[in-house]
UniProtKB/Swiss-Prot annotation:
Belongs to the NqrA family. The gene is nqrA. It catalyses: a ubiquinone + n Na(+)(in) + NADH + H(+) = a ubiquinol + n Na(+)(out) + NAD(+). It comes from Actinobacillus pleuropneumoniae serotype 3 (strain JL03). One of its GO terms (biological process) is sodium ion transport. This is Na(+)-translocating NADH-quinone reductase subunit A.
Amino acid sequence: MITIKKGLDLPIAGTPAQVIHNGNTVNEVATLGEEYVGMRPSMKVREGDVVKKGQVLFEDKKNPGVVFTAPASGTVVTINRGEKRVLQSVVIKVEGDEQITFTRYEAAQLASLSAEQVKQNLIESGLWTAFRTRPFSKVPALDAIPSSIFVNAMDTNPLAADPEVVLKEYETDFKDGLTVLTRLFNGQKPVYLCKDADSNIPLSPAIEGITIKSFSGVHPAGLVGTHIHFVDPVGATKQVWHLNYQDVIAIGKLFTTGELFTDRIISLAGPQVKNPRLVRTRLGANLSQLTANELNAGENRVISGSVLSGATAAGPVDYLGRYALQVSVLAEGREKELFGWIMPGSDKFSITRTVLGHFGKKLFNFTTAVHGGERAMVPIGAYERVMPLDIIPTLLLRDLAAGDTDSAQNLGCLELDEEDLALCTYVCPGKNNYGPMLRAALEKIEKEG
């Protein structure tokens, strides 16, 4: 077991009840283009086209053969594009239940599948896009070979769903999906299942080729970047792949039913949610519809993902992300507080222990307010308190801010994704957002070396 001591469990109100309910019915779903790093789409559909579930919507020009499929049957009502015609979303109005069928196998056959059989089914169904690489967090090329594959079956993000609750509903499908993953490279590459040390994820009998790694401690103990760092670190010439446990369930169902499984069980939670809980919805769900009559009055920000690293869901991207397993809702913090800096702050939380709210175990109604403007970095040890990886965070963040990619690479930036620096952003006295800085550095390194 690996114990994480440095980090932070954010004391945020609105913790979800770990019981699954049916969410609001949604009649719109979307595939979001900006989730896929470096992807350039070659569109296979137009507005007004009727599509089946599992039908190809677009293909990646930079990664030929990697296709992105429809999460539901219906009509393509809108293809949203942003600046420089960057694809934002392909929106489908859900109608009917027609779907493309794929090759199915008996459960007893899964352990003897060839790598080609596994790969073909994953690519054709669009489930190849469930994989992401480290470094760079991109959908892997079809001819790429990783050092290992990581399955993340734990989640320490604020307000997250407990994977154990979800996996109890899909125990057989999860095991089938893990078996399929072991066959992707004919059993030649290790598959690591990372779980909470206290969770009781059923894996009996043991699956050949699956190595279980247990983690405990504070966030970011549940991030895949933490798992990779301690188990099989990456570098400029070494790549690993990872995916989440609900995509493993989808893979298991694909191979045993021949159908694309797009159900999602997510956490709908946060200070502005009336009844925080786990809800059953579908991949790409319209979040305005999903959260209708679920939120407290006022101006709210709906986030696809964690409050620390998720994306604002509004306008053309008002949909559940491909990799999101939670929807978080905060009040927009537009109110100004007179002399807030001098008040004792019994209703505020700070990692520096400079306010009264630090004392006693209480939950806080966090808002989107950052309480100050962007300014210079202040190295007071805050980054080191929340960074459990074997890197020097202050120096790395300085190099990212300065655009020094050579030094940043030497300090370990290739191991990281935006979510790995989310706590550094949260505790930064200078109110700097280090996620975009990291992404800019990774893009430059990939392009120029």
